[in-house]
Swiss-Prot record:
UniProt organism field: Shigella flexneri
A cellular component term, taken from the record's GO annotations: cytosol
Gene3D superfamilies for the chain: PSPTO4464-like domains
Lineage summary: Bacteria, Pseudomonadati, Pseudomonadota, Gammaproteobacteria, Enterobacterales
One example of a Gene Ontology biological process annotation: assembly of large subunit precursor of preribosome
Keywords: Cytoplasm, Ribosome biogenesis, RNA-binding, rRNA-binding
Role according to the record: Member of a network of 50S ribosomal subunit biogenesis factors which assembles along the 30S-50S interface, preventing incorrect 23S rRNA structures from forming. Promotes peptidyl transferase center (PTC) maturation.
Name of protein: Dual-action ribosomal maturation protein DarP
GO molecular function: ribosome binding; rRNA binding
Protein family according to the UniProt entry: Belongs to the DarP family.
Length: 183
């Protein structure tokens, strides 16, 4: 006859007094596997980062070399190294690592949003001309009106002549410089 979990608790001698702090939390095997798989995905996400972004993540002395090694390894060895990184992450507090990753992703998302706004502004500058230039000057008073007009005029000529949009790219770069100098 095999004992069930309830029977195990009854056989403990001197356990007549119940203590609320000694409560046992049962965790299913599949939940443990899900947590391990999630940490392995977190490790893979860290491994996929570039070197500059990797140094912004708080990693200890054992984990950083394992991640740098995984970045150099290919194929099957990489999979095994990712499993090792997942195992190492299970023994650590991963919350600071997750927060740093979220911060990096958020910064990237903010840049994407800014680039979309600048692209829309560039398109309005090419289509509307002086009205959009006034908007740019309201946003960035130190913008050079003459340079913008020249770039817009050249961009319109390139667009009409079906030439590569060199001036449109220059407008975007100029707007990006203005936005970066502001912030």
């Amino acid at each position: 006859m095999t004992k069930q979990p309830e029977d195990w608790l009854d056989d403990v001698p001197g356990d007549d007094i119940e203590d609320e702090d000694d409560e046992i939390i049962w965790v299913s095997k599949s939940e443990i596997k899900r947590d391990a798989e999630e940490l392995k995905r977190l490790g893979a996400e860290i491994v996929d980062l570039g070197k500059n972004a990797l140094y912004k993540i708080p990693l200890d002395a054992d984990l950083r070399p394992a991640i740098e090694l995984a970045q150099r390894i290919k194929m099957e060895g990489r999979r095994r190294q990712l499993q090792l990184i997942g195992k190492m992450l299970r023994q650590r507090d991963v919350e600071p690592i997750r927060q740093a990753l979220d911060k990096l992703k958020n910064r990237h998302n903010q840049q994407v949003v800014l680039f979309h706004k600048l692209e829309n502004l560039r398109d309005r500058l090419i289509d509307q001309g002086d009205d959009a230039i006034a908007e740019v000057l309201n946003l960035w008073p130190d913008a050079d009106r003459q340079q913008l007009r020249t770039l817009i005029r050249n961009a319109k000529k390139e667009k009409e002549g079906n030439k590569p949009p060199k001036s449109a790219r220059q407008i975007f770069q100029y707007l990006r410089e203005l936005a970066e100098n502001e912030g």
